[in-house]
Regions:
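Single conserved hydrophobic/aromatic residue that forms the stacking wall/gate
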Residues: 174-184
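Conserved alpha/beta-domain cores
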Residues: 1-160, 165-167
């Protein structure tokens, strides 16, 4: 479980760390830099996940601080991440965001473009794509979208799925090969 720590002060996060929570999610780069830069230097076990929309101009701040990106959704961003990783000599674990419901208001790679995008990211840009991420539509049967993500995971032979939010937790329990990462 990724503890979503966005908007919470360190005074509320520290008890989680003291009790063994190591994976934390942030969606605002500047807030994360201010909050986590010093504590991550002191505690190398902590893993920080970028769970929000990432703009290319923020990548230079994300690569040195974060360990995971859950929102890779376009080739320009992929190229910027690849370039910055070379500069910083660091390889993040990256999830491709899939627009599983084909919703115009949501970011993400369309299913029909996913295989080509994945291959470009892994073969040409040498990105470490560890999984797929989706935020399912609020309408319809969420489980069907999760099942479709499981099939996409198998087709691409990636390790992990990052799917859903706290309210999707029970549904994920009943999904075959459910999410490896859940934001709570």
């Amino acid at each position: 479980i990724i503890a979503v720590s966005k908007t919470f002060p360190m005074s509320e996060i520290n008890p989680l760390i003291e009790n063994g929570q190591i994976h934390f999610g942030e969606n605002k780069v500047q807030e994360a830099v201010d909050k986590w830069s010093d504590i991550k230097k002191l505690n190398k076990n902590l893993k920080l996940h970028m769970i929000g929309k990432l703009q290319t101009n923020k990548v230079k701040y994300v690569v040195p601080l974060f360990d995971y990106i859950h929102s890779l959704d376009n080739i320009k961003l992929a190229e910027k991440i690849a370039s910055e990783q070379i500069k910083k000599n660091k390889n993040l674990k990256i999830f491709i965001q899939v627009n599983i419901g084909n919703e115009s208001q949501k970011s993400g790679i369309n299913i029909s473009d996913l295989k080509n995008f994945y291959e470009k990211c892994t073969k040409e840009l040498n990105l470490k794509i560890v999984g797929l991420m989706c935020l399912p539509p609020q309408h319809g049967l969420v489980k069907n979208y999760f099942d479709e993500m499981v099939e996409l995971k198998k087709k691409l032979n990636v390790e992990d799925l990052s799917m859903g939010m706290s309210e999707d937790y029970l549904c994920l329990l009943y999904t075959s090969d459910a999410a490896d990462e859940v934001r709570r």
